């Protein structure tokens, strides 16, 4: 179905810079996210008929309710999307609208960048559709403002069509998903639902209830700096220790060599001097045993290097971030079966594959609310080549409406 306000709403949202900050210690991590919630989303939620709209400054979540208009629809369903965007320029987002895309290259504004089907064959799935792209200088922010726009549009449709019967609906827009802490302070008591969905997936049909299990690894290397002219048998180069550590990890177990259910070690940062260096990694895997084995491996590498050095110069700090929500959702597949049924009725083929990443739903599921993930439409997310199809967004709205009417 076409929805008159969906495109304009999405464009309005993406023009607001809500980039999160991994180095911040506040919640939300950036003031712009709170401003977006309070000055744009909250008034709009109230205007379209959501009730009890309130912002929690402790956890950064904006929540609203649409009560059921049919008492026989007894389920309570939640929909969640995140306000922040990824670690890429989000200032002065200037979306391009490509009507009736007919294939071929899309020049991104006046930049030297283009969307080329040879580099991005997923473009070929969108012939004849309306695409929203960047101008080549920023990301787009479809991750996850497409999800916000879809939820808002579905609520607006339901409140404007009171004859359409639906169950109790909760809506939550949260911060800092992109930096992995968005759901850390989520309050289940403020979101009383039987299950929920994050609208944070990619192409049409995605329905996901398996995520990575994730850990952050920080390794500090302590060197000993002396003049290089007299360094023999004295200098210990911390940067070289970092290189040695990295080379002991399996070379083929990096993101660029893995897919499907394969896990990886990913070096995300390396800084330092001869005296001291620091390497940042993320560790990802799907199965609990292999996830734990990866953590044991890095500990063993550090121990081996320290034994060889004769002193403790490789210091490992490991912190689990989130776990594969499959463990929770498999206990009750109601949310998945309902979504599959609705999609199939809408002639959308459910694409059930693992998320090679995480969502806020990962943590929220372990808090007691099963929260799988549904497509929101974004492609090539987190950079200047990001785009989204208006038609896919419309279909996501259809799914939301179908879910609450069938509950």
Swiss-Prot record:
One of its GO terms (cellular component) is cytosol. Pfam families: M20_dimer (PF07687), Peptidase_M20 (PF01546). The active site is at residues 84, 177. Zn(2+) 1 binds at residues 82, 143, 200. It is found in: Cytoplasm. Keywords: Aminopeptidase, Cytoplasm, Hydrolase, Metal-binding, Metalloprotease, Protease, Zinc. The keyword Hydrolase applies. It comes from the Bacteria. It catalyses: Release of the N-terminal residue from a tripeptide. Cleaves the N-terminal amino acid of tripeptides. Belongs to the peptidase M20B family. PANTHER family: PEPTIDASE T. NCBIfam families: peptidase-T, PRK05469.1, PRK13381.1. This is Peptidase T.
